[in-house]
Amino acid sequence: MSLELEKNKDQNKLLLSELNQRIAAIKLGGGKARLEKIRKQGKMTARERVSFLIDDPTVAIEIGAMAGYEMYAKEGGCPAGGVIVMMGYVSKKLCVVVANDASVKAGAWFPITAKKNLRAQEIAMENKIPIIYLVDSAG
């Protein structure tokens, strides 16, 4: 292989590694301590609720995981826009599933949360598929 090709390959591997690290951090929502607090209350986290509902989470796709990335730093951040949006099968029917992430500011909405919810609704309407909301928020 050419030197140029090897450089590009290495650069892409580095970028993919960085993306995977960011996604892993985003999947922690408001952090390990908040996730544990939710579990101690006897509740499932937003991601656990979605995984439980969807027939096969391995064939589902998350929409907008990077929403809110590096936004709202003064407020402590807003991973995934404070809401999980997945497309997957529920009882063998393709659906959009939206779940408030209570680990992010107790499920409070940020402007990016509203945009992400609207996008989820647009996707459901444009594709004529059901949308399911799993709500867990302080108000």
Give the label of every model feature segment.
Residues 1-139:
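Terminal-region recognition feature
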